Amino acid sequence: TRFIIGDEIQYGEFVRSIKILIGKQNPLKLSELKLIELVERHDYRIGIKSNLEPNIKEGIGGLRDIHTILWVSIFMFNIYKLEDLTSINIYTKEEIKELKNAWKFLLTIRAFIHLFNESKGDVLSIENQLKISKKLSYKDKKKEKGVEIFMKDLFVNVAKINSLLRTFYCLLYTSPSPRDMPRS
């Protein structure tokens, strides 16, 4: 969670209560449950029209995958910020930078989806792809339309998130402790 507005004391009490609740759980079991949820969500997304109209939140490499990294980091390591994953050798500083840039890109797209739909939504429709690519100043080139360049950038970003999520789980389950893994 993050404090946006309201009573900071009440927010602090809420965060403390969540930490206590999480602390009482088996971290490995919680991590495994998140992995099962992730696999089921990814299996569902394969083969549907998500490539033409991707779901920015629930799709493979979407916002939910970043949330999974954050939740498991809290369960397993009591780490609440992505950048702190460098301290236990999960990611390099460059990987964190890439992950945060991809996250920001997806959040920007999602905000435009909400704006253009005038409601909550996570599917990047073909109609909104064109609108958002223009808002983000993607220009047509000789051999490629601006919207195509935008969609390529989107797929590069979701592929990066998916790759870093897989790295996260591989290190989590193949190393006695991610802290022991040397990373460049």
What are these regions, as identified by a protein language model?
Residues 173-182:
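Conserved small/polar residues in nucleotide/adenosyl-binding loops
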Residues 3-27, 38-47:
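Long, amphipathic alpha-helical stalk/connector segments used for oligomerization, subunit docking
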Residues 25-172:
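Conserved nucleotidyltransferase catalytic core and NTase-mimicking acidic/glycine-rich helix/loop elements
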Residues 1, 109, 184:
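Catalytic metal-binding acidic patch
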